[in-house]
Amino acid sequence: MAVLSKEYGFVLLTGAASFIMVAHLAINVSKARKKYKVEYPIMYSTDPENGHIFNCIQRAHQNTLEVYPPFLFFLAVGGVYHPRIASGLGLAWIVGRVLYAYGYYTGEPSKRSRGALGSIALLGLVGTTVCSAFQHLGWVKSGLGSGPKCCH
């Protein structure tokens, strides 16, 4: 039986925080549906005046949902051997997604680049997962930043 470290609790809290962020974005879409009168099941507005703003709010949420499963996978797996690093990167991803969404909400899609931190953090989580796999396979003896045989 494998035992997770006590520090894996940070990973669990980060996963819970990410759900709160996704729920916040969903609430914003719900409010925008009422404000811009976009009924279910219509995904996008065709209103020439305000439809663009609603569509940006909707896309910010949808794009986050598109990347959410890989985020959770890399957070959970990368956190097995590197819980603090994975949690820090996970929090950076959450902040990045909020910045991305609020940049997108302006109606100027180019402002979503404010959330680039999230993409960088996700790449870091991929790295922690690969490093964890190397450690688990015994290809390296220690983890990130732990001496001459760390995952670089």
Swiss-Prot record:
Any one of the GO BP annotations: leukotriene biosynthetic process
Location of the protein in the cell: Mitochondrion outer membrane
UniProt keywords, alphabetically: Lipid metabolism, Lipoprotein, Lyase, Membrane, Mitochondrion, Mitochondrion outer membrane, Oxidoreductase, Palmitate, Transferase, Transmembrane, Transmembrane helix
Protein family per UniProt: Belongs to the MAPEG family.
Purpose of the protein: Displays both glutathione S-transferase and glutathione peroxidase activities toward oxyeicosanoids, as part of cellular detoxification as well as synthesis of bioactive metabolites. Catalyzes conjugate addition of reduced glutathione to the alpha, beta-unsaturated C=C carbonyl group of eisosanoids such as leukotriene A4 and 15-deoxy-Delta12,14-prostaglandin J2 to form GSH adducts relevant to the inflammatory response. Catalyzes glutathione-dependent reduction of eicosanoid peroxides to yield the corresponding eicosanoid hydroxides.
Main subcellular localisation: mitochondrion
Single GO MF descriptor: leukotriene-C4 synthase activity
Cytoplasmic side: 30-70, 141-152
Pathways involved: Lipid metabolism; leukotriene C4 biosynthesis; Lipid metabolism; arachidonate metabolism
Topological domain ranges for the Mitochondrial intermembrane compartment: 1-8, 92-119
Originating organism: Homo sapiens (Human)
Lipidation (S-palmitoyl cysteine): C150, C151
Origin: domain of life: Eukaryota
InterPro entries: MAPEG, MAPEG-like_dom_sf, Membr-assoc_MAPEG
Protein's recorded name: Glutathione S-transferase 3, mitochondrial
Matches recorded under Pfam families: MAPEG (PF01124)
Tissue-specific expression: Predominantly expressed in heart, skeletal muscle, and adrenal cortex. Also found in brain, placenta, liver, kidney, pancreas, thyroid, testis and ovary. Almost absent in lung, thymus and peripheral blood leukocytes. Expressed in mast cells.
TM segment ranges: 9-29, 71-91, 120-140
Enzyme Commission identifier(s): 2.5.1.-, 1.11.1.-, 4.4.1.20
UniProt topology in membrane: Multi-pass membrane protein
Example of a GO cellular component annotation carried by this entry: endoplasmic reticulum
